Amino acid sequence: MDNYIFDLDENVTRTPVSYKNRYGITIAADLYLPKDLDESRQHPAILIGPPYSGVKEQGSGIYAQNLARRGFVALAFDPSYNGYSGGEPRHASSPDIFVEDFSAAVDYLGTRPFVDRERIGGIGMCGSGGFLLSAAQVDRRIKAVATAAMVDISRMASKGPLDSLTDEARAAMLDDLAEQRYADFLNGTPALGPRGAPIGFDENTDPVGREFGSFHSTPRGYHPNSITQFTLTSSMAFMNFPLLTHIKSISPRPILFIAGEEAFSRYFSEDAYDEAAEPKELHLVPGGNHVDLYDRTDVIPFDKLTEFFTKNLA
């Protein structure tokens, strides 16, 4: 249970932990603490959800470690059905359960004696950005929300990239998924969809696939638990349940949207920013693409995140 894509900082401790969400699924997580943390006092804490199909040994662990270096208690977790977390079938995806995983992380952090449960914030990376925002709409224990390279998976599934999916194409997709349910039932196991990150890619690969492949399919970000695939029929739930319907209800708790200036996903952050109520901020990383915000510590604005959480978890 290792294969971390980054080295552990000498000033940080990392402890594997586990706990159950409200569905009884065991969540595997890593708790990061400053090595000199005074556990007799209560401290602010931040939970970090990984990119869609990512695991805690990748980008979310990098975020957790860097925030622990700056004095925060930080928790990186594997979503249900993925990584080292429990749940069957493997690699299923669910809007409700992935949102619940954030509240379960709050349950865990808020019951640690060294955590001030009134000062818990969260970071959602890529698809987890949408799940965290959705969780914060109803879970008021989450006092401050930041997203990095946010993607609204429900919008992507229902409308396609840049909302390009026509009504006819959507209906045809739903017909195919309905037939897939019959096939899964007869086979006794759900089929997986295509990889989001191609294993072999070159200059002829579509730019988004090439970008994901440059992270997930190379030594830069590869982890055996991050297969970048979900069960095919997972899309049906996302096509039926939009994640950000109540985003205005997060106010007056603050939201920080971070996106790469050159990211294909930038429009998700911009549109969510427009829909959200104050206080809110949109921070564009100059020259940054989508996966730059997964692991590039020279690009990820950790000083901005530290300022945001220090102010709003005071």
Which residues does each PLM region occupy?
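N-terminal cap/lid segment of alpha/beta-hydrolase-fold proteins
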Residues: 2-41, 294
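Conserved alpha/beta-hydrolase
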Residues: 66-86
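Alpha/beta-hydrolase fold nucleophile elbow
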Residues: 113-126
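Alpha/beta-hydrolase-fold enzymes
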Residues: 133-214
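Short beta-strand/loop motif that positions the catalytic acidic residue
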Residues: 250, 256-259
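Catalytic histidine-centered segment of alpha/beta-hydrolase-like enzymes
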Residues: 288-299
